[in-house]
Regions:
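PRPP-associated nucleotide enzymes
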Residues: 1-182
Length: 182
């Protein structure tokens, strides 16, 4: 698959009568991890936080280009299948897609978002006169940690100015601008 399919993917597939196969693209663009429960069952997930809700403890990340096969007896078999795997995760996972309480490839999503706020604060300090900013307002939900960090470092008030409609899906993935505006 790695030689034929270019792009980002983390795949989990049930092979009826044999077991479960999981693999990640050679650059580890999309996250994939494995957890184990006290009784020895194995769970695969895109985010570590998913494991916690099912009494599984994080065991390890599936490496870029690695395949995991879990047979019917629960035995885990791992093999590196890519020629030159290199970790190059998608920044969008850390900025927007992942839950803040997840850890992906050893990086806390929450901490990554705080770091983004700190980086932005340094840039703002060097480019914007202090009296030109009145308040820091996040765009819900994922920008909250970054905005809070930015407000703290700039000594500005942090306010919730937008309310997310929880009954509407993610607008950036809707098929066209007209639908997104609607």
């Amino acid at each position: 698959v790695h030689r034929r399919v270019k792009g980002s993917y983390a795949v989990i597939a049930l092979i009826a009568g044999h077991g479960v196969l999981a693999f990640r693209d050679p650059f580890g663009i999309r996250p994939l991890c494995m957890g184990k429960s006290a009784d020895g069952t194995v769970m695969l997930a895109s985010e570590s936080v998913t494991l916690e809700g099912t009494s599984h403890q994080f065991d390890r990340n599936i490496d870029p280009g690695e395949a995991i096969f879990i047979d019917l007896q629960g035995n885990v078999h791992a093999k590196q299948c890519a020629d030159a795997p290199t970790l190059k995760p998608c920044i969008f996972e850390f900025v927007y897609l992942a839950r803040p309480d997840s850890v992906m490839d050893g990086i806390s999503v929450y901490q990554a978002r705080l770091n983004l706020g700190e980086t932005l604060a340094k840039r703002v300090i060097s480019t914007v006169p202090p009296n030109e900013i009145d308040v820091v307002i996040p765009i819900p939900e994922s920008s909250r940690p970054s905005a809070a960090q930015l407000a703290q470092l700039l000594g500005l008030p942090y306010r919730e100015g937008f309310v997310k409609n929880r009954y509407v899906g993610r607008t950036f993935i809707m098929p066209g601008q007209a639908v997104r505006k609607k």
